[in-house]
Amino acid sequence: MNTVRVTFLLVFVLAVSLGQADKDENRMEMQEKTEQGKSYLDFAENLLLQKLEELVAKLLEEDSEESRNSRQKRCIGEGVPCDENDPRCCSGLVCLKPTLHGIWYKSYYCYKK
């Protein structure tokens, strides 16, 4: 009966000592995994940041295109039909009714002052 107790005690001591080693080993493995996880998170964060920067650049480009397209239209040159309510004749020109008789596509044209 004494040998059974000694054997049991020996097995118990070995199990506890090996269990502690496994616990320390598990702790180290967890630290390594969290460090790897942090590096993966950093990589994912950088990738997301790059995509967001590309998206912002694209949106800013679209805004600048809109501002270019929304500029005032170019002026109308001499002898070109114009609208009497909204004359867009160039400077030095006036939107007037033609002095010549005939059939005209538009009734007003840009002429020099």
UniProtKB/Swiss-Prot annotation:
Signal peptide (from-to): 1-21
Propeptide residue interval(s): 22-74
Keyword field contains rRNA processing: no
Localization annotation: Secreted
Disulfide bonds: 75-90, 82-95, 89-110
GO MF annotation, one: sodium channel inhibitor activity
Record key words, sorted: Disulfide bond, Ion channel impairing toxin, Knottin, Secreted, Signal, Toxin
GO cellular component annotations of the record: extracellular region
Primary subcellular site in the record, as a coarse category: secreted
InterPro entries: Toxin_22 (IPR012627)
Tissue expression remark: Expressed by the venom gland.
Record function comment: Probable ion channel inhibitor.
Protein family (similarity comment): Belongs to the neurotoxin 14 (magi-1) family. 01 (HNTX-16) subfamily.
Domain commentary: The presence of a 'disulfide through disulfide knot' structurally defines this protein as a knottin.
Protein name per Swiss-Prot or TrEMBL: U11-theraphotoxin-Hhn1a
